[in-house]
Amino acid sequence: MYLCHHVSSRKEEPLALATTLPRPGLEAHREAITLAFPELVSRLTGYIGRKLTAYVAGVKDVRSVDGWIKGNSPYGDAEERLRLAFQVVRTLIDHDSPRVVQAWLTGVNPELGDRIPLRLLREGDLNLVGPEVMGAARAFIAGG
C-alpha cells in the first residue's frame, strides 16, 4: 500500500504573541488616565473604601472624597495620587479580592524594602514611588 503525504502550499502566519499575551495593568492604566475624576474616585472607594481613599489623597476626613464624587475639584496633588492609586488597585483587583488588595496596600511590602504601599503613594514623590509600587503590584500578581 502506498501512502501519499499532502503538503499544503499555504504559508502559516506567525503568531501575534504581543497581542495575545495578557498584560497586567494595561486596562488599569487606560482607565486611570481616561476616567472622569468623580467616576475614578467613586470606583476607588468601591474597591478600598472612603477612609483609605481619603488617606492616600492626603485629606483628613471623607467629606472631601464625598465632594469629589459629587464633582468638586481636588486640590494640590490629590488627583494625581488618586489616579496612581486607582491604577495600582485596579491592576490588583483583577487578580484578587478587595480584602486582599486592602491588606496589600496597608501592609509592609518586601518588594518595597518593607515600606507600606499606601504610605508611599500618599507621601512619596510619585515619579519615584509610582514605578516602585506598580512594580511591586506586578510582582505580587506574578507570585500568585
Q: Which role does the model predict for each range below?
A:
Residues M1-G144:
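Non-transmembrane "mature" sequence context
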